[in-house]
Amino acid sequence: MSRLYAIILIALVLNVIMTIMPDSKVEAVSCEDCPEHCSTQKARAKCDNDKCVCESV
């Protein structure tokens, strides 16, 4: 029975990790789409070396 609890616990931890990870990933967004992309994150759009960077407001 303890194996079942361990498997459920591991599944829950993996679920939380998968939920958090995409937020920390840098997305390749062109400068044209940058303002629209950053507005969904409530951040200010900025272009660095032709890459979109969202700065916290």
Curated annotation (Swiss-Prot):
The keyword Secreted applies. It comes from the Eukaryota. Disulfide bonds join 31-47, 34-52, 38-54. One of its GO terms (cellular component) is extracellular region. Keywords: Disulfide bond, Ion channel impairing toxin, Potassium channel impairing toxin, Secreted, Signal, Toxin, Voltage-gated potassium channel impairing toxin. Negative results: does not affect Kv1.1/KCNA1, Kv1.3/KCNA3, Kv1.4/KCNA4, Kv1.5/KCNA5 and Shaker IR. Selectively inhibits voltage-gated potassium channels Kv1.2/KCNA2 (IC(50)=183 nM). This is Potassium channel toxin alpha-KTx 8.5.
